[in-house]
Each structure stands twice: as structure tokens, then as C-alpha cells.
Curated annotation (Swiss-Prot):
InterPro entries: FAD-bd_PCMH (IPR016166), FAD-bd_PCMH-like_sf (IPR036318), FAD-bd_PCMH_sub1 (IPR016167), FAD-bd_PCMH_sub2 (IPR016169), MurB (IPR003170), MurB_C (IPR011601), MurB_C_sf (IPR036635), Oxid_FAD_bind_N (IPR006094). Coiled coil: none annotated. The active site is at residues 181, 230, 300. It catalyses: UDP-N-acetyl-alpha-D-muramate + NADP(+) = UDP-N-acetyl-3-O-(1-carboxyvinyl)-alpha-D-glucosamine + NADPH + H(+). Belongs to the MurB family. GO terms for cellular component: cytosol. Its cofactor is FAD. Keywords: Cell cycle, Cell division, Cell shape, Cell wall biogenesis/degradation, Cytoplasm, FAD, Flavoprotein, NADP, Oxidoreductase, Peptidoglycan synthesis. It comes from Chelativorans sp. (strain BNC1). This is UDP-N-acetylenolpyruvoylglucosamine reductase. The gene is murB. One of its GO terms (molecular function) is UDP-N-acetylmuramate dehydrogenase activity. Pathway: Cell wall biogenesis; peptidoglycan biosynthesis.
């Protein structure tokens, strides 16, 4: 029996009341935007917040539970994920509604581009930058994603989240503890929805701002490639892409993974990359930048999962274990 089948059989009675979808041995390469990585023992897609809470209460705390959102800013290693992976469904967590003239309540699984389009139709300004963020709202809330000089934290009023025990928490903007590409409140929580606030603005002005965002992306980013977005955070006082370029890493390839010639802070899967190729490439870039400029780049992409045994002894990746 596979690991997923064994776990499902072990917990069968505990999970019998769930309404969401359980998939054993789910290929993470079908979920992540990199289209690489191993299998999750069990993938759970809850129907709604109540179903997710019931799941979290049913699964013993010693069994790992990992949230992956819509898989955009994520690199999964080749031996996959132990325990459960939770992916919020668009049906239960992907809707948005206007709750006041300038406020929107949106589910964590709504794609950022769809949120921007929804705000446009509602005539609510300040959401145009979401049109330039690859991923979903849950990830944007977790990492304070931003584009075109605007960050998610500037729009957040409150965030709903469940902890590992299935208990509900509601955080104000201040309680989220936002900083550059991070939120202090994100550890161990699954964000389910948020209330966001913009301002009244003419739809044509909003549309023009969104068009400008789209034009910028198409001009400088490899948006039609298999990519997870920005690979590294910008160091203080400089840009990650500049340091990568100065270190001679534009277009650098390892296996099927490449630092995009178009934007060298975007790592792409050219078609055959494994999770190992992608992470090894990223670590090679970090080493070369450190040697060239003394700057230690920090990963912006989240890396999860287990290495295959023949990969874990690699001298570059050994420091990551």
C-alpha cells in the first residue's frame, strides 16, 4: 500500500464526516505553478470554512498539515509531502462580495487577478496592483505580496484564520504584524478570508492602472513560463535581479531549471525541471551572489517537502536540511 492509502485507512473513521475531497498520493506537480515536485500523502480540498475546521479537529496534531493555496509561490521537493496537504477550493473559498462602498470581503482562494477585476467592476480603487501578483489572496495575505509599489497590507482591514486545532481567529491589520514580504501572525494558521478596503474611483481610471500593470508584466516578466514569481526577496538598498545579473547568473541553467533571461529573479521550468533542479539552481545563484557582492539573498519562494535520499547529501543542499 502507498503512504497515502495507509494514512487514509488509519484515519478513516475520523474523516468520515468531511464533505471535502480527499485524494491519496496526489502529485504536487499538478498543483504548483512550477509543475514539479513529488506526491502529497493526502490532499484535502475542503468545501468551506466549517468543513476545514472539522478536518483540522479530526486530524491528530502529530500528523503534519501543510497549506498550499493555489500553488504559485511554491517549490515542492521531489520526495513530496508527508501527512496532509490542504488546498482551498475556488468554490468554497474563491468568492468576493462588496460589503460597503469601499470594502470587499474575499475568500483566500480567489486569484489575485480576479480580485482586481472584481474591484474594477465595483468601482473600488486601490486593488489594481493585485493584477500584477501571480497567485491567490491567501498567499498575498501570508507574505504581504506587492507589486508596482503597493503591498497587500495597505488594503487589509481584518483577516479570518483557523489554527491547527480548528479554532477560528480574526486579526486586525495591526495584529497581522506586516513587514516586507512577511506577516508575524501567519505561523501555523490557515487564512480563509479577509476584509479589504480601497477607495471610490472612476472605473476608467482603475482600468488604466490595471492595463499599466499588465503592460509592465508582459514587458519585463516571463509570465507565460512555468514560474513561481520572484525567486528572492529584494535586499535592502538594491534589487535581487541586479545582484543576480552582476553575478553572471542571467540565463543560468541546471537541468531543466533556468534563471529567466527576460527577468533573472524569475526561475522557470523549461519543461523537464525537477524540484531538485530548481532548488539547486537557486542555491547556486545565492552562492555566486554572495561571492560576488557579499549579499546573502533570501528566498521569497516557499520551499517545502522532502528530498529524495540521493539528493540530501549534495554539498549545496546539505546546508538546507
Amino acid at each position: 500500500m502507498t503512504r497515502g492509502s495507509v494514512l487514509l485507512e488509519k484515519l478513516g473513521d475520523r474523516l468520515s464526516g468531511l464533505r471535502g475531497r480527499l485524494t491519496p498520493d496526489a502529485g504536487m506537480d499538478k498543483i504548483t505553478w512550477f509543475r514539479a515536485g513529488g506526491e502529497a500523502d493526502l490532499l484535502f480540498q475542503p468545501q468551506d470554512e466549517e468543513d476545514l475546521a472539522a478536518f483540522l479537529k479530526a486530524v491528530p496534531e502529530e500528523i503534519p498539515v501543510t497549506i498550499v493555496g493555489i500553488g504559485s509561490n511554491l517549490l515542492v521537493r521531489d520526495d513530496g509531502m508527508r501527512g496532509f496537504v490542504v488546498r482551498l477550493s475556488a468554490k468554497g473559498f474563491g468568492e468576493a462580495e462588496v460589503i460597503s462602498p469601499t470594502r470587499i470581503r474575499a475568500g483566500a482562494a480567489i486569484p489575485d487577478k480576479r480580485l482586481a477585476a472584481f474591484a474594477l467592476e465595483a468601482g473600488i480603487g486601490g486593488f489594481h496592483f493585485f493584477h500584477g501578483i501571480p497567485g491567490g489572496l491567501g498567499g498575498a495575505l501570508r507574505m504581504n505580496a506587492g507589486a508596482n509599489g503597493v503591498e497587500t497590507s495597505e488594503r487589509v482591514v481584518e483577516v479570518r484564520a483557523l489554527d491547527r486545532r480548528g479554532e477560528l481567529h480574526v486579526f486586525s491589520n495591526a495584529e497581522m504584524g506586516y513587514s516586507y514580504r512577511a506577516s508575524a501572525a501567519s505561523q501555523g494558521l490557515i487564512f480563509t478570508s479577509a476584509v479589504l478596503e480601497g477607495y471610490a474611483e472612476d472605473r476608467e481610471a482603475i482600468r488604466a492602472a490595471m492595463d499599466a500593470v499588465q503592460h509592465h508584466r508582459e514587458t519585463v516578466q516571463p509570465i507565460r513560463e512555468k514560474t513561481g514569481g520572484s525567486t528572492f526577496k529584494n535586499p535592502e538598498g538594491t534589487s535581487a535581479w541586479k545582484e543576480i545579473d552582476r553575478a553572471g547568473c542571467r540565463g543560468l541553467m541546471i537541468g531543466g531549471a533556468q534563471m529567466s533571461p527576460m527577468h533573472c529573479n524569475f526561475m522557470i521550468n523549461t519543461g523537464t525541471a525537477t524540484g531538485y533542479d530548481l532548488e539547486y539552481l537557486g542555491e547556486t545563484v545565492r552562492a555566486r551572489v554572495l561571492e560576488n557582492s557579499g549579499i546573502k539573498l533570501e528566498w521569497e519562494i516557499k520551499r517545502i517537502g522532502a528530498f529524495k535520499p540521493d539528493h540530501s547529501v549534495d554539498p549545496f543542499l546539505g546546508q538546507l536540511l
